[in-house]
UniProtKB/Swiss-Prot annotation:
Catalyzes the ATP-dependent amination of UTP to CTP with either L-glutamine or ammonia as the source of nitrogen. Regulates intracellular CTP levels through interactions with the four ribonucleotide triphosphates. One of its GO terms (biological process) is 'de novo' CTP biosynthetic process. CTPSs have evolved a hybrid strategy for distinguishing between UTP and CTP. The overlapping regions of the product feedback inhibitory and substrate sites recognize a common feature in both compounds, the triphosphate moiety. To differentiate isosteric substrate and product pyrimidine rings, an additional pocket far from the expected kinase/ligase catalytic site, specifically recognizes the cytosine and ribose portions of the product inhibitor. ATP binds at S14, L15, G16, K17, G18, I19, D71. GO terms for cellular component: cytosol. The gene is pyrG. It comes from Herminiimonas arsenicoxydans. Keywords: ATP-binding, Glutamine amidotransferase, Ligase, Magnesium, Metal-binding, Nucleotide-binding, Pyrimidine biosynthesis. Residues 1-265 are annotated as: Amidoligase domain. This is CTP synthase. Homotetramer. CTP binds at S13, D146, I147, E148, K186, T187, K188, P189, T190, Q191, K222. Residues 290-545 form the Glutamine amidotransferase type-1 domain. Allosterically activated by GTP, when glutamine is the substrate; GTP has no effect on the reaction when ammonia is the substrate. The allosteric effector GTP functions by stabilizing the protein conformation that binds the tetrahedral intermediate(s) formed during glutamine hydrolysis. Inhibited by the product CTP, via allosteric rather than competitive inhibition.
Length: 552
């Protein structure tokens, strides 16, 4: 039978519940348990797919094509289990499901209410996501005291009661702020947060106390006394320079022991050697590179969370410190791309909409003409294709119908029929809903032999997608005639998946790659990702070559 660990948060949001839950999951997995994580989001949106990155941050895509909370990216980076659609659900999905059942008459004429119908539906979703695992960690979004979170907390309380003794544990993450004026840590917000949780009927088995410094024993004892949590279960979680130190921090204070005792589990001892090695590699780099990332959401770097982590993973596996500087594509559009000359490599990530796109096109051209390693992801590939079509292939009016619906040369266009990750044929048009109408999830395609992509991936590539627009095959042949290499295509529709510049000949470039998919979703600190590792190696080579020029 699956055991449950519910992770809640108090005082303020953005304390790091996802990192805490993923770190505990990593420890439990190292103890031989089969572990998964679920994220319960209280917002009414069906999923985050149509939410602004400034509102929500990154949308993480699972292998089976779900658009989910960015915390699922943390989950996959900390444990080996892959997340699925069932690992993330929202208030919107719950109400949508309950209303469908009511319309079908499944409630037999009863008055449909939050209790029991909504809370029962939440429990059903939790059990569905946890099926087949020894332990499921369930992160409840929001903050205790929020109206939106109440049905989820009530469902967790009911599930714990129904599942019986030793079937569920509650871990509460809270803030212990340091007041400079008083010169001390303040425990009162934590006391009130636990009190609020207990009013709901939930008594935490462990407290994770976030602070900017380790919490002294006397303060932990005070928190224990007023929150009715054993002192050894009051865990100090202070600011760390890398999230990959958190598993060791929690293990050193016995959080996994407390949880296992509560759940009556006796697994093997933990082995955190993989995290020790990762942290050592992060703290002892032999090289350094600086990447210029040209995007439109640069004021909120959470929008590129998986991407920045993938670059850091590549740094771990190349013994390099990867410095990332975020550049607003609108500023490049206004002042020109000359500021990019100082970078060891340039990356243009995915995105949507017309704003700042000409700055991204200028960045792609600057990288091509100055032999700077270039990596274009999703939209980053499309702008590189547009740039090459305009300035090399003679298609001077080339554009995407996303930015100019009436463009005379739509080298990038909306695809209206495609095969999804499960083989199902999907269709859409300009009038389709925005939500859930993209090419989503993992797909596999063959890689053209003799290309840079083949050196990186081998014979085939399987990656995750999230986009509506594709390279237009009507123009792709002309661009290929001008020297661009299409090194991978989808098997069913022959859509461009990878494009690159040749490394020899008239249009030679040392490393210039665009991909239609999102490889960052498959990167982990344990293994890195071959494409990002190759990119960082190219950045190192470019940096070395530029330094050699200065010497001579």
């Amino acid at each position: 039978m699956t055991k449950f660990v519910f992770v809640t948060g108090g005082v303020v949001s953005s304390l790091g519940k996802g990192i805490a839950a993923a770190s505990l999951a990593a420890i439990l997995e190292s103890r031989g348990l089969k572990v998964t994580l679920l994220k319960l989001d209280p917002y009414i949106n069906v999923d985050p797919g149509t939410m602004s990155p400034f509102q929500h941050g990154e949308v993480f895509v699972t292998e089976d094509g779900a658009e989910t909370d960015l915390d699922l990216g943390h989950y996959e980076r900390f444990i080996t289990a892959k997340m699925r659609k069932v690992n993330n659900f929202t208030t919107g999905q719950i109400y949508e499901s309950v209303i469908r059942k009511e319309r079908r008459g499944e409630y037999l004429g009863k008055t449909v209410q939050v209790i029991p119908h909504i809370t029962n539906e939440i429990q059903d979703y939790i059990y569905r996501g946890a099926e087949g695992f020894d332990v499921a960690l369930v992160e409840i979004g929001g903050t205790v005291g929020d109206i939106e979170s109440l049905p989820f907390l009530e469902a967790a309380r009911q599930l714990s009661l129904r599942a019986g003794r030793n079937a569920a544990a509650f871990v509460h993450l809270t803030l212990v702020p340091y007041l400079v004026s008083a010169g001390e840590l303040k425990t009162k917000p934590t006391q009130h947060s636990v009190q609020k949780l207990r009013e709901i009927g939930i008594s935490p088995d462990a407290l994770l106390c976030r602070a900017d410094r380790p919490i002294p024993d006397d303060e932990r004892a005070k928190i224990s006394l007023f929150s009715n949590v054993p002192e050894d279960a009051v865990i100090s979680v202070w600011d760390a320079d890398t999230i990959y130190k958190i598993p060791q921090m929690l293990y050193d204070q016995g959080l996994d022991r407390i949880v296992c005792e509560k759940l009556a589990l006796s697994p093997k001892p933990a082995d955190l050697s993989v995290w020790t090695k990762l942290v050592h590699a992060l703290e002892n780099p032999k090289h350094s590179v600086t990447i210029g990332m040209v995007g439109k959401y640069v004021d909120l770097t959470e929008s590129y969370k998986s991407l920045t982590e993938a670059l850091r993973h590549a740094g771990i596996h190349t013994e390099s410190r990867v410095n990332i500087e975020y550049l607003d594509s609108e500023e490049i559009e206004a002042s020109g791309p000359q500021c990019l000359a100082k970078y060891d490599a340039i990356l243009v990530p995915g995105g949507f909409g017309k704003r700042g796109v000409e700055g991204k096109i200028a960045a792609a051209r600057f990288a091509r003409e100055h032999a700077i390693p270039y990596f274009g992801i999703c939209l980053g590939m499309q702008v590189a294709l547009i740039e090459y079509a305009r300035n090399v292939a003679g298609l001077t009016k080339a554009n995407s119908t996303e930015f100019d619906p009436d463009t005379e040369q739509p080298v990038v266009a909306l695809i209206n029929e495609w095969q999804n990750h499960d083989g199902k044929v999907e269709r859409r048009d300009l009038n389709s809903d925005l939500g859930g109408t993209m090419r989503l999830g993992s797909q596999t395609c063959a890689v053209k032999p003799g290309t840079l992509a083949a050196e990186i991936y081998g014979n085939e590539v399987t990656e995750r997608h999230r986009h509506r627009y594709e390279a237009n095959n009507h123009y792709l042949g002309r661009v290929e005639e001008a020297g661009l290499i299409v090194s991978a295509r989808t098997p069913a529709e022959s859509l461009c998946e990878i494009m690159e510049l040749p490394r020899t000949g008239e249009h030679a470039h040392p490393w210039y790659v665009g991909v239609q998919y999102h490889p960052e979703f498959n990167s982990t600190p344990r293994d890195g990702h071959p494409l990002f590792i190759s990119f960082i190696k190219a950045a190192l080579a470019h940096k070395q070559a530029e330094e050699s020029k200065k010497v001579t």
